């Protein structure tokens, strides 16, 4: 019997060509969840490669839209790397739109996506996908252990918040997030999960087992709900 569905947003810092061992571990965890019936969609960020391309585009004087397109293509390459690691249990192409994603999702295979369009973060994509497939949970596999009162990379006194509302989460993001460092959800993504009342679990993605643990129902990291 199918379980979920669950959307997992994985930082591009963990799924990229510089970390094949970690990509393999993510593939193993996703295989395990899929084998026991979970319907899964994974959205992968662009990571360091995207930032390199964006910086090069900036130095060339290219506009934000072109920078976004390069970042999207980097995220799609990361997604394709994970797809190949998941073969044959993953849909063979990273979808380019929500419609392509829904078609891929209908196959029952694990779907792995990157970015969709300029001006939209991969976190925004994950929120939109979670809404479109009626996800029971959105997991954010980030570079921190959960949601903190401040960016833990710059404020050593920052405290982990185990549970918070969407509005409290929005306030933390607005006041405490350092661009490019403390990866959570952007304001548009928060609005999407709030309007559809999708629970969001934030965990440290450096260990793929953390993702499996929260999908299986363990209390870990931070939980954002209505």
Curated annotation (Swiss-Prot):
Pfam families, per the entry: AA_kinase
Regulation of this protein's activity per its record: Inhibited by UTP.
Gene Ontology BP annotations: 'de novo' CTP biosynthetic process; UDP biosynthetic process
The keyword Nucleotide-binding appears for this protein: yes
Keywords in alphabetical order: ATP-binding, Cytoplasm, Kinase, Nucleotide-binding, Pyrimidine biosynthesis, Transferase
Any Gene Ontology CC annotation: cytoplasm
Reaction(s) catalysed by this chain's protein: UMP + ATP = UDP + ADP
Positions that bind ATP: 9-13, 47, 51, 142, 148, 151
Coiled coil: none
Broad class of the protein's primary localization: cytoplasm
GO MF annotation list: ATP binding; UMP kinase activity
Annotated compartments: Cytoplasm
Residues given in the record as UMP binding sites: 46, 68, 116-122
Assembly notes: Homohexamer.
Protein purpose: Catalyzes the reversible phosphorylation of UMP to UDP.
NCBIfam families reported for this sequence: pyrH_arch (TIGR02076)
Family as reported in the entry's similarity comment: Belongs to the UMP kinase family.
Protein name, UniProt field: Uridylate kinase
Organism: Hyperthermus butylicus (strain DSM 5456 / JCM 9403 / PLM1-5)
Lineage: Archaea, Thermoproteota, Thermoprotei, Desulfurococcales, Pyrodictiaceae
């Amino acid at each position: 019997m199918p379980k979920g569905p669950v959307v997992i947003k994985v930082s591009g810092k963990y799924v990229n060509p510089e970390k094949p061992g970690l990509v393999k571990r993510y593939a193993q965890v996703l295989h395990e969840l899929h084998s026991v019936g979970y319907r899964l969609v994974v959205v992968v960020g662009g990571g360091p490669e995207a930032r390199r391309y964006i910086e090069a585009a900036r130095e060339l004087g290219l506009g934000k839209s072109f920078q976004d397109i390069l970042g999207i293509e980097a995220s799609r390459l990361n997604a394709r790397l994970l797809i190949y690691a998941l073969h044959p249990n993953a849909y063979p192409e990273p979808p380019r739109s929500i419609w392509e994603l829904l078609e891929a999702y209908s196959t029952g295979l694990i779907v792995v996506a990157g970015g969709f369009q300029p001006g939209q973060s991969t976190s925004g994509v994950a929120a939109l996908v979670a809404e479109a497939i009626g996800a029971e949970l959105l997991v954010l596999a980030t570079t921190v252990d959960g949601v903190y009162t401040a960016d833990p990379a710059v404020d050593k006194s920052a405290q982990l918040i185990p549970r918070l509302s969407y509005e409290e989460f929005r306030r933390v993001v607005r006041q405490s997030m350092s661009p490019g460092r403390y990866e959570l959800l952007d304001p548009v993504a928060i609005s999407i999960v709030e309007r559809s009342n999708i629970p969001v679990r934030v965990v440290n993605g450096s260990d793929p087992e953390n993702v499996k643990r929260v999908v299986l129902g363990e209390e870990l990291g931070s939980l954002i709900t209505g």
